[in-house]
């Protein structure tokens, strides 16, 4: 764990902790796109720190406390009860304040969401199908439910590499377009994040 942390730990006075590299890729891309349009992206003085999973969030917060660093967490809805319990304990001990924990589901005003739910379903399916050579259609997906759990179900309940579609997006950015709905979700997210620092 110490080695993983040392590899990932590039910090600045203002740090946004996210679960993985895919969060970093999506957030950086949409921040740049929105700024080019004259809209709000992530503040330049905020560093995105991918920690390698929800289970490592609490460890990173512990490492950063006491260093006069401002830390905000941006998380998928918890599915790991132990990671959620560790974070709640840190809030109780005032190691991090509850208002500095942002969940994608709160920005999207849903009960459950991952970063992939910031996209319209058809846009994320374009990334997924392009990555894995599949032909999943919008009709195969329930628009009211989180997309990742549905894709896992359609993949015989096997997990898949969440970074791969983000990497596909980065490599094919010139041929991809995203809707105003998706851009608005990301802009709303950046406004929420920027207001926390």
What do these predicted regions represent?
Residues 30, 122-123, 127, 131, ...:
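Generic structural signal for hydrophobic core residues of well-folded globular domains
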Residues 22-25, 59, 110, 114, ...:
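Generic recognition of stable, solvent-exposed alpha-helical segments in well-folded globular domains
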Residues 1-80:
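RecA-like P-loop NTPase motor core
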Residues 150-152, 159-197:
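Terminal low-complexity/disordered tails
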């Amino acid at each position: 764990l110490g080695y993983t942390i040392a590899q990932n730990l590039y910090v600045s006075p203002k740090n946004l902790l996210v679960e993985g590299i895919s969060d970093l890729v999506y957030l950086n891309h949409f921040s740049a796109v929105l700024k080019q349009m004259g809209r709000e992206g992530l503040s330049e003085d905020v560093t995105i720190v991918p920690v390698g999973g929800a289970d490592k969030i609490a460890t990173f917060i512990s490492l950063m406390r006491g260093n006069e660093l401002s830390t905000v967490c941006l998380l998928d809805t918890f599915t790991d009860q132990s990671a959620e319990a560790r974070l709640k304990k840190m809030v109780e001990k005032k190691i991090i304040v509850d208002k500095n924990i942002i969940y994608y589901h709160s920005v999207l005003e849903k009960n459950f969401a991952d970063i992939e739910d910031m996209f319209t379903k058809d846009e994320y399916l374009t990334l997924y199908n392009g990555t894995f050579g599949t032909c999943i259609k919008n009709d195969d997906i329930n628009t009211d439910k989180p997309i990742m759990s549905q894709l896992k179900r359609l993949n015989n309940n096997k997990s898949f590499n969440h970074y791969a579609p983000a990497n596909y997006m980065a490599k094919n950015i010139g041929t991809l377009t995203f809707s105003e709905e998706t851009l608005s979700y990301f802009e709303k997210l950046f406004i929420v994040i920027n207001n926390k620092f």
